[in-house]
């Protein structure tokens, strides 16, 4: 085995272990934020939505800067610093009793994410061969789902005792992750050339095809982020207990572990990437509309199943398409900018979703936020169809198995 092949093989295992630690640390804390501050402390949903939206926007909106800096200085220092910063954010969240302190903790968490997330994504592009990326992204998503359930179960159990224990556990996991990267991650360059920060950013911004694709995905993310805000609130409201939230993530894990990899393997040879992305988005949109009208957990979990199936179809295609479109001379910058759609869509989804949820309750129209999200999903579906029908993306990057 050549040294390059050996490095790629070892890199896969490193990425999988690193990803599991990050997912566990995140999901111990974040699914419980809405339950802690809305249900237990009685805050308005929009206040918590602002906090979650701020974290999302900081982490993803500034990703191009984190990616460009990583292109210049390498992945390791950015990843280690970012993970320590997120640990500090979680520690601060544990003592948050005023909205401004929750917002500050989410700001720190998001800033840490903008440092470590783009270089981690760029390492996947660097280490995994193009023909294997779709399947590797599917493996990461399966791992994300399993980690989400384990993290949510652990967080829900700790929440019975003290929210500070929840945050301390998340902080410790990110400190361990920082030490793991500091010890084992080689000083790899992300790009084929050492690209200056401004040059990497300029290269991305001049790529109109990539910019259009990323911004169009904002609507997709408005739906996707509700697994952190409105879906847990809805489950808690109908069940009458925050313990039921863990079953929502158990459903996601079961579907991902059983369907994600087989669907990705089967569809990658038969359907173009944009068709898989659009099909998944359509299923997600259709499942959102009736959620506000359900009256029991069985109906709600059925719709959540449909939503997750849509995500299982769409996510590997979205990640693979983003990676395929990245310029090898500025991988960090491209993968950082690819998060901008999540920044915009996530911020609007959290803040707008929280506001619509409060508004729906005030007007006794609980279906209002869900209907709006479904409409946004359909608009995004049409926008993606228009974009791809105009051949804005090179055909070879969209072909099955590309």
UniProtKB/Swiss-Prot annotation:
GO molecular function, one term: transmembrane transporter activity
Cytoplasm is among the record's keywords: no
Cytoplasmic topology ranges: 1-12, 117-138, 186-213, 265-276, 321-339, 389-402
UniProt cross-references to PROSITE patterns, sorted A to Z: MFS
Residue intervals annotated with topology Periplasmic: 34-98, 160-164, 235-243, 298-299, 361-367
Annotated membrane topology: Multi-pass membrane protein
A Pfam short name: MFS_1
Residues spanning the membrane: 13-33, 99-116, 139-159, 165-185, 214-234, 244-264, 277-297, 300-320, 340-360, 368-388
Keyword Zinc: no
GO CC, one annotated term: plasma membrane
Keywords from the named record: Cell inner membrane, Cell membrane, Membrane, Transmembrane, Transmembrane helix, Transport
Subcellular location(s) of the protein: Cell inner membrane
Main localization (coarse): membrane
CDD domains assigned to the protein according to its UniProt record, in alphabetical order: MFS_MdtH_MDR_like
Origin superkingdom: Bacteria
Family: Belongs to the major facilitator superfamily. DHA1 family. MdtH (TC 2.A.1.2.21) subfamily.
Name of this protein: Multidrug resistance protein MdtH
């Amino acid at each position: 085995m050549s040294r390059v092949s050996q490095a790629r093989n070892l890199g896969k295992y490193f990425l999988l272990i690193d990803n599991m630690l990050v997912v566990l640390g995140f999901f111990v804390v974040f699914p419980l934020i809405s339950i802690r501050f809305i249900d237990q402390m009685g805050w308005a949903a929009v206040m918590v939505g602002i906090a979650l939206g701020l974290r999302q926007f900081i982490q993803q909106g500034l990703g191009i800067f984190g990616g460009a800096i990583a292109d210049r200085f390498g992945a390791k220092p950015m990843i280690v610093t970012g993970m320590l910063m997120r640990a500090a954010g979680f520690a601060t969240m544990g003592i948050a009793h005023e909205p401004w302190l929750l917002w500050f903790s989410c700001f720190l968490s998001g800033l840490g994410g903008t440092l470590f997330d783009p270089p981690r994504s760029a390492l996947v592009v660097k280490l995994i061969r193009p023909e294997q990326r779709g399947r590797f992204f599917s493996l990461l998503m399966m791992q994300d789902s399993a980690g989400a359930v384990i993290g949510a179960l652990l967080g829900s159990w700790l929440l019975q005792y003290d929210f500070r224990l929840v945050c301390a556990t998340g902080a410790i996991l990110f400190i361990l992750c920082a030490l793991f990267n500091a010890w084992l991650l080689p000083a790899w360059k992300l790009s084929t050339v050492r690209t200056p920060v401004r040059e990497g950013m300029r290269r991305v911004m001049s790529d109109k095809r990539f910019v259009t694709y990323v911004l169009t995905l904002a609507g997709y993310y408005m739906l996707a982020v509700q697994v952190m805000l409105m879906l847990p609130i809805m489950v808690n409201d109908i069940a009458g207990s925050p313990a039921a939230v863990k079953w929502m993530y158990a459903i996601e894990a079961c579907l991902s572990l059983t369907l994600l990899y087989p669907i990705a393997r089967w569809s990658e040879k038969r359907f173009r990437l944009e068709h898989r992305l659009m099909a998944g988005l359509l299923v997600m949109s259709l499942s959102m509309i009736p959620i506000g009208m359900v009256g029991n957990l069985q109906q709600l979990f059925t719709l959540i199943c449909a939503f997750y199936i849509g995500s299982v179809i769409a996510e590997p295609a979205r990640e693979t398409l983003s990676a395929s479109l990245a310029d090898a001379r500025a991988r960090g910058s491209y993968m950082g900018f690819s998060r901008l759609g999540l920044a915009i869509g996530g911020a609007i989804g959290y803040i707008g979703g929280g506001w619509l949820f409060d508004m729906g309750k005030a007007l006794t129209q609980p279906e209002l936020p869900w209907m709006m999200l479904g409409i946004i999903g359909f608009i995004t579906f049409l926008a993606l169809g228009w974009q791809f029908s105009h051949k804005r993306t090179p055909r070879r990057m969209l072909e099955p198995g590309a």
